[in-house]
Amino acid sequence: MKRVFLMATLLAMTLFSASAQEKEKRCIQLPSWLDNLKLSGYGMTQYQYIGQEGAKSNTFNIRMARIALEGRIAGDFYWKTQIQFNGNTSNLGSSPRMVDLFAEWQKYEMFKVKIGQFKNPFTFENPMHPIVQGFMSYSQNLSKLAGFSDRAGEHASNGRDIGLQLQGDFLKNANGRNLLHYQIGVFNGQGINTKDVDNQKNIIGGVWVMPVKGMRIGAFGWTGSYARKGTWNDDEQGNIVYQKDAAGNPVLDEEGNPKKETFSGVRKLSQNRYAFSFEYNVNDWTLRSEYIHSTGMAFAKSITNHGDANSKDCNLNGKIGNKAQGVYALVIAPIVSKKLYAKARYDMYQANGKTDMMRTQYEAGLNYHISKNFTILTEYALINDRTLQKHNYSMADVEVCFRF
């Protein structure tokens, strides 16, 4: 009996070993760079009420839904790709699209090299996660002057472009904390998922000091152009140009109206911007303020689809001219640390650099972090828009956000 039991045990062990070896042969050996592959994502659902006269609305919305893959290769190289998949495919503003695809060599803390599609190195708020940023939208000056819904007429690009960037931290103090950060990059200047049009690159960069823990004081610069290929009928100030005969008299059409001149080719608009930034995170409080100034004309119509007429319309927006500026200041204060926060923001933007087109948002609300990965954002805003006949109206916003 013992002999039979021993033989059965040996047979079972042999079969188990053979089965394990067979399974091992069938397994696909993943490359080492996939060992630390990370999948992440987040969603932001939204309800928003707008009380503007003649344009009142209240609607549920998917503000944002993204999924990302990231990892490291050979220790020194970090890579990431991220897709935004909410919206529809009718236009570039809300259609699914790739927002990030880059690799960065990170061997040295003071000298890192990044290439691909990623955030413009401009302002403190631009690279912030939208849930961490904490309000119903990024500030107006950031949205219009950092590549989101840019005043120049560029398609919605989430503050990003395609290019090459250098950055680093150095000058450590006695506690080993870096006191200085720099970042500078060369970009196409056309926004995400788009090749260069005028072969002139944008140079964008910034530097900030960190005198005490949690504090940053920075300055940023942006110089370059935004271009389109198409047709236009106006001069460099946005004034319509009419045809004239050899004697200098207006050329009229069949109905007796003056005929417009038509120009064609690549039209590029210089863009020169700078920003000053301050941020202080201390004892669970957040204080931040940024001022941005811009010089440069804008196209009259923004691109929503690269195949439609707007993408080839190179006429200028003479109404807003060649200047713009804006500033915001915000505070996020703990009521219950790590859980419940009160917030307030002053957010002002001048589309033409003057008060007659000034739009100001006075905002207040609460943020409740149910857990590390689940947050509810609430907000009320009083809007003063001087371009409207009735300047003042209210907005309310509630967002339920999750991430993994």
Question: Where are the regions that the model predicts?
Answer:
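Residues in and immediately flanking transmembrane alpha helices
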Residues: 15-16, 88, 130, 303
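Outer membrane beta-barrel
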Residues: 26-189, 197-204, 208-217, 223, ...
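Outer-membrane beta-barrel pore domains
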Residues: 51-55, 74, 102-106, 117, ...
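N-terminal periplasmic/intermembrane-space "pro-region" immediately following the signal or transit peptide
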Residues: 1-44
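Alpha-helical transmembrane segments and their juxtamembrane interfaces
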Residues: 12-13, 85, 124, 300, ...
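Active-site-proximal beta-alpha loop/turn segments in soluble metabolic enzymes
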Residues: 185-193, 229-231, 235
